[in-house]
């Protein structure tokens, strides 16, 4: 019974995330009502609130699903390719308003920064010396740079593939971080 229940929970959460994705392509995020998400996902209000406190929590959960499960423990840029691939799938089927993208990418930037900051702090445990770059600064820099690269890619409708954009992003970050570590104060 437990396995069957887990599948139902996963199915419900997936349906809700897909409904939200479809709706953000049709209208501004701020104008989407929970009722619209429920109708699109064929989920009851009580079921929705069993899983999420509101549409913001649903949104953050979807972003975390991509960010937090991608390449943990590797380079601070390991989240990039899965997010670019996700956007590539959706940029072929429709566009969202600039206002919605700003709202969503603000949340994405915050989640990326949190993940990088946590990973950087974990990797420094027991080292004893100050890192070349403060973890908070590195996290904010990498996350903000990613959003700039992502927005440029989407705005220009660049023909570069997700893999190529990942290489561009990683190169920008590596160059900047390496330069910061070798530059004298």
Residue ranges and their predicted role:
Residues 33-34, 62-71:
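Short, basic, alpha-helical segments at the C-terminal edge of helix-turn-helix-like DNA-binding modules
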Residues 71-109:
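Hydrophobic alpha-helical connector segments
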């Amino acid at each position: 019974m437990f396995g069957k229940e887990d599948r139902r929970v996963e199915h419900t959460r997936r349906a809700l995330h897909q409904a939200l994705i479809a709706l953000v392509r049709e209208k501004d995020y701020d104008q989407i009502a929970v009722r619209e998400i429920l109708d699109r996902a064929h989920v009851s209000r009580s079921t929705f609130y069993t899983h999420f406190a509101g549409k913001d929590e649903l949104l953050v959960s979807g972003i975390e699903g991509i960010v937090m499960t991608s390449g943990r423990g590797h380079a601070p840029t390991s989240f990039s390719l899965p997010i670019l691939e996700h956007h590539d799938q959706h940029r072929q089927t429709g566009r969202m308003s600039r206002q919605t993208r700003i709202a969503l990418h603000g949340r994405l930037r915050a989640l990326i920064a949190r993940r990088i900051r946590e990973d950087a702090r974990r990797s420094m445990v027991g080292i004893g010396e100050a890192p070349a770059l403060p973890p908070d600064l590195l996290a904010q820099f990498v996350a903000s740079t990613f959003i700039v690269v992502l927005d440029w890619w989407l705005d220009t409708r660049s023909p570069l593939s997700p893999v190529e954009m990942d290489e561009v992003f990683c190169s920008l970050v590596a160059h900047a971080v390496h330069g910061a570590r070798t530059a004298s104060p």
